[in-house]
Amino acid sequence: MKISIIVGGKFHAFNLAEQINKKKYLQQIITSYPKSYLKKYGVNKNKIYSIILKEILLKIFNKINFLNHIFDYNYLLCEYFDNKASDNINYDKVDILVGWSGFSRKCFIKAKKFNCIKILERGSSHIKFQHKILTDEYKSLGIKPNVPSSQMIKKEIEEYDLADFICVPSQYVKETFIKYGIKKDKIIKIPYGVDLKEFCVVESKKRKDNKFRIISTGSISVRKGSHYLLEAFKELSLPNSELIFVGSFDPDFKKIIKRYSNIKNIRFIKKQKQELLRNFYNDSDIFVICSIEEGLAMVQAQAMACGLPVICTTNTGGSEIIDDNINGYIIPIKDTQSLKDRIKKLYNDRRKLKQMSKSAYEKANNELSWEKYGDRMLNTYRGLLKTKKNI
């Protein structure tokens, strides 16, 4: 079995490549990251093709805030990567071609001439569902929507059709695909894992204070529902508490932040390297994520591995890894009252908080490693190849 991966970025592709490579099944990975970045994942340079210009241009364009409202540079960069990648895949040596959504249309078209299985990785909901739910949320806030363009929607829909299978991380995502006409037997559902060496309880680390600390990591944005957490925290006004966000701001969200600038016990910390992030988890009591739309936010498993109970919305995909009322709480999207109730419950009941923290840690360590994820993926790939041979 030989597997190749196409990914215009990082996502969880490098974790997947690491697990496939350990079993000697990795043929090739094409990415926009430099070859040196995959060294920590144990992938040999001769198995990597790097299209680094895509990543360089993306970083430059992202710094020019208004640019995306003038033209869809993200789509153009995806097209550039896709075209370049499609010319550098060893199609005749591949049994399974795994491509990330938005980067794989041309690759899959060329792959049709060869006898390989095409699997599309989609980490978020169906792009039409994503577009609608986010457009509605932006409009409700009076902000110009920052959503997938019509060009990107068309590209991804074509990828859905070209793929033999679509791999998603949660039941929530799977249901959005079914809603938009994708057959159930075309969808594979496998939740992501977490690096248990990188994210863990640091026993030697002592808390600097006894504040009840809520943490949220990842982008601070409309999509992540950060405004619902801000509003809930403001309304609760809990004594000796603190809310910290660790991550980068979406430019559009800065308008919303101004409404909460007078609250002293809210901190915004810039995006951190993965190896430093665990220190912030270890210095907190609970993790909260209020996403309007997601796939399976990997920060949830990170927080659990560091011993934090998670409060999440249904649309984070968290129900795949969180047991409601045992190691976290799952609430409806946009429900500030439910969010306040769950936060207050853990604030008032420290015994319950301790029990849930222990359960979260155990769940992550027993079930959520990348090794277990890799085993599930490889078993799925083997099953698909076996079925193909029997047809």
Q: Over which residues does each language-model region extend?
A:
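Aromatic "clamp/platform" in nucleotide-sugar-dependent glycosyltransferases that forms part
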Residues: 292
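Acceptor-binding helix/loop patch of EC 2.4 sugar-transfer enzymes
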Residues: 41, 59-72, 114-155
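Short hydrophobic beta-strand element within catalytic cores of glycosyltransferases
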Residues: 309-312
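Conserved donor-binding/catalytic core segment of Leloir-type glycosyltransferases
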Residues: 206-224, 230-235, 244-246
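Short alpha-helical donor nucleotide-sugar binding micro-motif in glycosyltransferases
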Residues: 271-272, 279-284
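Carbohydrate-associated surface elements
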Residues: 172, 193
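Nucleotide-activated donor-binding/catalytic signature segment of Leloir-type glycosyltransferases, i.e.
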Residues: 254-275
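Conserved acidic donor-binding segment of nucleotide-sugar-dependent glycosyltransferases
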Residues: 324-325, 329-336, 345-350
